Amino acid sequence: MKRILDGMKRTMMAVNPPRYTALEGLQKAETASPFKILIGTVLSARTKDENTTKAAKALFKVYGTPQKLANAKVKDVEKMIKSVGFYHVKSKRIIEVAKLLISKYGGKVPADIDQLVEIPGVGRKTANCVLVYAFEQPAIPVDTHVHRISNRLGLVSTKMPEETEMELRKNIPKKFWLDINNTLSLIHI
């Protein structure tokens, strides 16, 4: 497994400029925070990485904390994130998430999958992304790309992303979990 992941990473880094997913970009940013990773992950659903990055940069220039975003007007947020898919729905959702983080978690993003999936709009994939990119906790975020590539590589034989996550968790040593999503997600670019 290490050989496969290392080979894929080397290939992606050989491209000039090297390729990164939007979430890895958020993670590496000087102003990275669990809040920005969570909101960036919500924005990234069904959206190309370059559009997620564009929207996240615009959004976080003005609304970089849960407190600021919780007080935002939906129309103002919509203008900033217009490049992402379903921006009308996501604008309302991320404001709702910011308000919930303040009321339930004191403005902090929980580092627990069970608490994360209780947040509206946060499923296992988003929760696992937050664990990996915000808290560097071993988890396996599985989206449609990771699901498809895992099946094509013969790592799993599953029908649904949730099944893929569980099979990968069984079959891949935990020490590789942090790299799986980012490495396999880059293959589809």
Language model features with spans:
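Catalytic DNA-binding helix-loop module of base-excision-repair DNA glycosylases/AP lyases
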Residues: 38-43, 94-100, 108-155, 161-167, ...
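Alpha-helical interaction segments
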Residues: 25, 167-168
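Short, hinge-like loop/turn segments at secondary-structure boundaries
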Residues: 159-160, 177
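N-terminal polyanion-binding entry modules of DNA glycosylases/AP lyases
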Residues: 1-111, 175-176, 183-186
